[in-house]
């Protein structure tokens, strides 16, 4: 007996049943020969291979090699119908593009693997592109190469360069704006009282009590940027970490622990002065200044037990 599956593909009842069972496990599910025999309740390998061959002829199943073992994978009816309309050369070119996934494949690699003439390959690619089966994308690693992938897929980060690239070009303006936003956000945690008190105050490192959280995490930064909608691309904690490491390299941040950063006092002073390092003479005077606890006491938050503390009437630093 024979049956029909959607899109007009003629199949026997056994082939239709096997395909339905394979697709019920989800797109991309792989099956061994033994698993297919068990699903169909077929003891004879010859009978199973007859059904599998029917599905192969209709492009409703394909062979996939996994860990040196040959397995079977079901194909959507719409995808099979698409291949049914292709010429033999187009189907061959399409199969290599499909296998390349989100990494894509270079047009010259297609020619080498298919052993087709350059003119035939270009004709197939043009036809597949016009039908929106495949598309060409730019690679940041190989800008002169024409990379092809399935039309429905999004290129991998290795191809696009991630959020730092726009149309294959490094977006310096976008990166610099994010670096400024990240630094500003972290500085509000490191110096919550603002920066103006450093303009004429002591140019020394600020000390904190152990219970003071004067840093920001990459997750906090990401949540802030996402909520503020300052980026039109999706960022990840790894992207934020990369930005923070750039600021660490520029001595604008220092790493407290894993994925935790705080701004440096030098970056605050540089921003307030509008210039780089202070003059050598002023630096020498700073080094000679005596340390006084009164210049730093505001950085230690009051404790709820302070009222019970007994102080000496007089004490010396």
From Swiss-Prot:
Sorted UniProt keywords: DNA-directed RNA polymerase, Nucleus, Transcription
Disulphide bond pairs: none
InterPro entries xrefs: RNA_pol_Rpc34 (IPR007832), RNA_pol_Rpc34-like (IPR016049), WH-like_DNA-bd_sf (IPR036388), WH_DNA-bd_sf (IPR036390)
Subunit structure of this chain's protein: Component of the RNA polymerase III (Pol III) complex consisting of 17 subunits. Interacts with BRF1/TDS4.
SUPFAM superfamilies attached to this UniProt entry: Winged helix' DNA-binding domain
Protein name stated in the entry: DNA-directed RNA polymerase III subunit RPC6
Top-level taxonomic group: Eukaryota
Swiss-Prot/TrEMBL GO biological process terms: termination of RNA polymerase III transcription; transcription by RNA polymerase III; transcription initiation at RNA polymerase III promoter; tRNA transcription by RNA polymerase III
Annotated Gene Ontology cellular component terms: cytoplasm; mitochondrion; nucleoplasm; nucleus; RNA polymerase III complex
Compartment annotation: Nucleus
Organism of provenance: Saccharomyces cerevisiae (strain ATCC 204508 / S288c)
Family: Belongs to the eukaryotic RPC34/RPC39 RNA polymerase subunit family.
Major place of residence: nucleus
A Pfam family per the record: RNA_pol_Rpc34
Role, per record: DNA-dependent RNA polymerase catalyzes the transcription of DNA into RNA using the four ribonucleoside triphosphates as substrates. Specific peripheric component of RNA polymerase III which synthesizes small RNAs, such as 5S rRNA and tRNAs. Involved in recruitment of Pol III to the preinitiation complex. Involved in the configuration of an initiation-competent form of RNA polymerase.
Effect seen on changing residue 171 to H: Cold-sensitive. Abolishes interaction with BRF1/TDS4
């Amino acid at each position: 007996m024979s049956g029909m599956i959607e899109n007009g593909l003629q199949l026997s009842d056994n082939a239709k049943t096997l395909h339905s069972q394979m697709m019920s496990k989800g797109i991309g599910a792989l099956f061994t020969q033994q698993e297919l025999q068990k699903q169909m309740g077929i003891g004879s390998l010859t009978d199973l291979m007859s059904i599998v061959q029917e599905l192969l002829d209709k492009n409703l199943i394909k062979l996939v090699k996994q860990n040196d073992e040959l397995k079977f994978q079901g194909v959507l009816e719409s995808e099979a119908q698409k291949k049914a309309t292709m010429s033999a050369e187009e189907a061959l070119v399409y199969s290599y593009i499909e296998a390349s996934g989100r990494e894509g494949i270079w047009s010259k690699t297609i020619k080498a693997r298919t052993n087709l003439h350059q003119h035939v390959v270009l004709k197939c690619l043009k036809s597949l592109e016009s039908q929106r089966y495949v598309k060409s994308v730019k690679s940041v690693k190989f800008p002169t190469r024409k990379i092809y992938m399935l039309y429905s897929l999004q290129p991998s980060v290795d191809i696009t360069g991630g959020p730092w690239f726009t149309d294959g070009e490094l977006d310096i303006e976008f990166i610099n704006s994010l670096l400024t936003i990240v630094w500003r956000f972290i500085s509000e945690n490191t110096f919550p009282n603002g920066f103006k008190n450093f303009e004429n105050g002591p140019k020394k490192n600020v000390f904190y009590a152990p219970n003071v959280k004067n840093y920001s995490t990459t997750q906090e930064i990401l949540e802030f940027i996402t909520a503020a909608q300052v980026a039109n691309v999706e960022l990840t904690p790894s992207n934020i970490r990369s930005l923070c490491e750039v600021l660490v390299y520029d001595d604008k941040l220092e790493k407290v622990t894993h994925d935790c950063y705080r701004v440096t006092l030098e970056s605050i002073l540089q921003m307030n002065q509008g210039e780089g390092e202070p003059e050598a003479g002023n630096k020498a005077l700073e080094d000679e200044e005596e340390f006084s606890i009164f210049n730093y006491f505001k950085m230690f938050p009051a404790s709820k037990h302070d009222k019970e503390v007994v102080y000496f009437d007089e004490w010396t630093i």
